[in-house]
Amino acid sequence: MFKKKLNMVSAAILIIALTSCSFNIDNLKNRFADNSDKPQEMAEPSELGSVANTVIIGMYDLDTFNPLMTKSETVKEAMEFVYEPLFELNEQVQPEPVLAKDYGMSADGKTIVINLRDDVKWHDGEGFSAYDVEYAIGQIRSGKTSYTELLKDVTSCSAENVSTVAVTFNHPVPCAAALFTFPIIKDGTDMEEKMRPVGTGAYSFSGKISTDRYMLNRFDYYYGGKPPIDGIYIDEAPDKEHYMYMCGTGAFDLSTSKTVDLRTYTPKGSVKLNYYTSNKLIYLGINNAKTELSGMNTRLAMSQLIDKEYITSSILYSRAEMTDVPINPSFWLYDGTKAQTDTLSAEGHLRIDAWTDKDTGGYARTIGGSTQTLALELIVDKGSEEKMQIADNIADKFNRYGIKTTVSPLEYNQYIQRVETKNYDIMIGEYKIPATQDISGLMGAGNIFNYNSDEMNMLINQIGMTSDTESLKGLFAQFGEKFTSDIPFVPIAYTKECMMSSPKIENIKSPGEGRFYRDSYEWRLK
């Protein structure tokens, strides 16, 4: 990661004349004459169909090719070849520059200043600039796109000059560069459905070449070098059922777990599975305001009784990685170690909180002359088979140990209402941790667990205001220690996502959160 202190420079407003998105090969030749020995000829659709050195991907639910607007996961994935982000996340959830060159953070952790590459061109030959970034972020902040939630804490974005953009947040954000993994569209891009894709990626959009096939041609003037693969075919299926059938017949060279459910689908043939640990956390939520659950030793005992290994291997089919803290196990700033090893048994922790196993069965205690029993309701979304199985497994473990637990499967809307109003004992939850690993949204003021700790709040704020790598590692380690001693809730596992690729494709880089097809310009075919 590049980090250096930057001086923000005020610049006059640049008035940009919008150009047509149509592909003008003569214009393109002129713009790139100095960068290529032999300019690329734009082929007609009939010629495109004969390209041999190609890869085939699938697509369905086409609504628009605008990568910020589409609601189709397959379209988003196809457009990864055409559009690029400022940064991408590697397998360690570490931001790596793509269109960005480097960046710096303000002392208060609220402003990121990003320097951009100066050798990037759009597929129509225009130069890439900070004004494109400003436009893309403006569209996202307007609420029009599927990325609006990602930048909900942004208060301002401005192009300081042609190669520098500054973005300010309403609170300190740790590892802020990790937020800028969305595709950048050109300044003035049509936000309507029928826009023609013009990106900066290794492959340019050539159009529809048959009834259900689109073509992406390699962009010979790509700043990363000429891609070895000539093109990408995008075969359109009428619906998901046909898409899955085509996957089953091996019609596609690439697909992902976002569109293919690996719980029910087994890839045929010699398909390579490229996994990464996502930021989606599955956990047992605990209502800390409940008298029976207010003691941290009670929560520690419950945590010890959960068989995370079984849940991960047998219920989630090893497509998850178990965890003890709400930080991605692959995260480059956290090594996952604990400062102290818990040597007490679950029974030992329960006894510290005055729980005893009565002859009648189950744990009880007497406080202020009143007898309490440790009997819990575990609510779960009945629409998720996985979560239902996890709930049943946890309830079985608790009941066997003497913690009386009843599972209550609820309709999704009813489940959400109970969680948001904090009307529950324990629950099976799911939360997508931001790529920044900023857990303030999960554990901040008013959190759904009724958990409050001044020490934890201070740690979270310090993490947000720190940019030094070694200092961040220390703070994340402190966070891990504090979390595992308090156990406001029980993290169970982070799910994994997967890119499935044909063995004929070489030089594939491990996918990362938010971008499956990383560095496709380096791919080769056997």
Regions found by a protein language model. Give the residues of each.
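Detector for C-terminal structural segments
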Residues: 305-335, 386-395, 419-526
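A structural "hinge/loop" feature
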Residues: 59-79, 99-100, 126, 176-183, ...
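Surface-exposed binding/hinge segments that line
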Residues: 104, 108, 148-189, 304
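Aromatic- and charge-enriched surface segment that lines or borders ligand/interaction sites
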Residues: 101-144, 292-294
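N-terminal lobe/hinge region of extracytoplasmic solute-binding protein
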Residues: 57-105, 138, 198
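Gly/Pro-rich hinge or "lid" segments in bacterial periplasmic/extracellular proteins
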Residues: 177-231, 236, 241-242
